[in-house]
Amino acid sequence: MGAQQLIYISKGRIRDMYEIDLFDGHCDTISRCFERGGGFRRSGGHLDLERTRKFRRYAQFFAIFGDSAATPGIPLWELTQREYAVFRREMAENADLIVHCRTGGEAEAAYAAGKTAAFLSVEGAELLDCDLHKLEEARAMGVRAVNLTWNHANALSGSNAEETHRGLTERGREFVRRMEALGMLVDVSHLSDRGFWDVAELCTGPFFASHSNSRAVFSAPRNLTDAQFTAIIEHHGVAGLNMFSDFLGEDPDVETVVAHLEHFLELGGGKNVARGGDWDGISKTPRGFGGIQDMDRLFERLLQRNYTEALVRDLFHNNLMRVVNEVCTM
């Protein structure tokens, strides 16, 4: 990058010079709409379609998420169906701006039509009753990634917050094998450490941590150890950096986010870091980041630090799309 380019960047001209592609691995926008009302086109949250339009290309994993404590009286599988109905409604009502995608090829078609590419995930297999038949139903609905646990332990494994000593049960192992056979991404964010290593042992292809940071940079059980991130590299997977302040550090800002990213890069993760903002599911974000509309600040900061544009585009979009192309083939 030439000196003149750096001068322009330092003046904040990045929006005029670069068109940004972004593929984010996790948001809770569906459950936000389910709980509070409203829709995808315009909201007061972290993410909406009016803001995704600012990017040249934008893809997002939208998570179906629910906690029985927050929705008493609604069985979790029924909650899954209700949130799926919200997702389908928003796809239909905003068909001019967004389309449900199942493969990377479908995302490319969405981009060509000037639309946001929406992928569907499930955060916590308890929403599928940890049941293989419901896993297959979810895949038929277009789900392409599943967190094995949320914060609660379930019939598949312990989590990072409950029964942390417990790894995958036999049913959990069957679930992982079936997900790989179905072309679905196994998501290890929220999983217990032992559960993580069981997944790493079982998976023959890429798996991912959709929204997890570095435990070496900030010690939180939800973050990844260096050994875990190295295992993700060895499986050609990705880790999506989370924008929740409590997983970044004390009074975080853009430099804190960069610190997590750079630590993963030092471990050899140039093709294995992605974005996973946890948008609309978090209460605190780093200073200067109110939602996806501010992600250009991170893009600009990385270029100011002499990251190549090719590397930044990998971190923001291409790495996660590569994994989707490899795993979600049908």
Feature roles, as predicted:
Residues 2-165, 170, 202, 215, ...:
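N-terminal hydrophobic targeting/anchoring segments and the immediately downstream early-domain regions
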Residues 98-99, 184-191:
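Catalytic beta/alpha-barrel core
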Residues 116, 176-184, 305:
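Short, surface-exposed connector motifs at secondary-structure boundaries
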Residues 152, 191-192:
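A generic "binding-loop/recognition-motif" signal
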Residues 167-181, 199-207:
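Alpha-helix-loop-beta-strand connector modules within alpha/beta enzyme cores
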Residues 193-197:
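Short, well-ordered alpha-helical microsegments
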Residues 212:
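Catalytic glutamate of the conserved HExxH
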